[in-house]
Amino acid sequence: MKDEQHHNQLEDDEDSGRAAAECIEIEPDFLKKLRDMTVNKNVEEMRKQRKNAVYIAGRLALAGQITVFYAAPNTGKTLIALKLISESIANGTAGENVFHINLDDTFDGLIEKADLANRHGFYELGPDRFVKPDENLRELVERLVNEDSARKAVLLLDTVKKFVDVMDKKASSNFMTICRRFTAAGGTIIALAHVNKKKNDDNEGIPAGTSDILDDCDCAYVMHALKDEIGPEGKWRTVEFLQKKARGPVVPEAIYKYHINHNDYSQMFNSVKLIEGDEVDRVRQQNAIDSEKAHDLEAIEAISSELDSSEPKTQKDILEALGQLGISRRTLIDCLKRWSCAQEDGGLWQLTRGDSNSNCYRLLD
């Protein structure tokens, strides 16, 4: 019995030895294959292909990266993106292979963008070429990567929701994997996406969908309209880009403005301009004033209805007249004080002194 056990043990030891020997023989081959998969041997070639801080859209997007612009509808994300990319084409940084994949537009809109494309050197692709956008994008990326053409191309994806269900975490992750495959081969992607209807506590847009697109991109901005104003040339919209994520020397924020003309897209396109220097401070100050006025709107409208620009009214008379509106006395007094300042600071009425040193107010001219 002992001899049989000893014999079995010897057989087990021999089997273990053979298995170990096989592992020793197999492992070096596999490790060599694994080493061959690494980028170490290609680093010099990759360095030659690397794009050193080449700006593709103003100073908001870098070549070789995935950049996402989030904005609500009618903010101007397509307009501004096309303008900035066209400037990069003109100065030679974007190359000759910029493709606007426009899946979120009307027939007339496609014609307008195609006219711009012909004038400014980019290429317009519409829904007829992307019947199944997710599959078509994957096929396009695979073809460009396999032909070593990705590094020569810029893709403007308009909009992300046409390529993927942004509420589907797995689908969003797969979409970003496709985008990463493209940029890992040297390509550049600028993707336009939407924000939720509900804003955050700072009144800023919240990227729509799961976090995967924001998590997996290189750079992202949330755009929001600061204000619309009427000037000698018509209505102008001012838009701010606020950075949510960055890899590389892109700006943390930027402000652009454009002339709103729904009858002439090319005129709107040509009007887009960057706001710089002192004008940035003025825009930010005005935006802060507008935000405060929006908070005080009910009280401002009530007080304004009681005042005129000729005869001042005492604070006591104003409060008595507005006493039945349901606005608290403290809110009205604070509003009277807050907006009795110079017009350049947002002032709405003038404070003067009446009998017995009483506070009197009249509308500013």
Question: What is each of the regions a protein language model found here?
Answer:
Residues V68-Y70, N74, L79, S173-M268:
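Phosphate-binding/switch region of NTP-binding enzymes
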Residues C23-A117:
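The Walker A/P-loop phosphate-binding site
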Residues T106, L110, N136, A171-I178, ...:
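Helical mechanochemical/support elements of P-loop NTPase systems and associated helical scaffolds
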Residues A57, T93-S173:
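Conserved inter-motif catalytic segment of the P-loop NTP-binding fold
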Residues G64, E96, A150-R151, A184-A185, ...:
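Structured loop/turn residues at beta-strand edges in well-structured enzyme cores
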Residues E87-N91, A117, F163, F182, ...:
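Conserved, well-folded catalytic cores of nucleic-acid-processing
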Residues K2-R35, D148-R151, E229-D365:
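C-terminal regions of RecA-like/P-loop NTPase motor modules
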Residues T67-F69, V98, A153-L157, I189, ...:
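Generic beta-sheet signal
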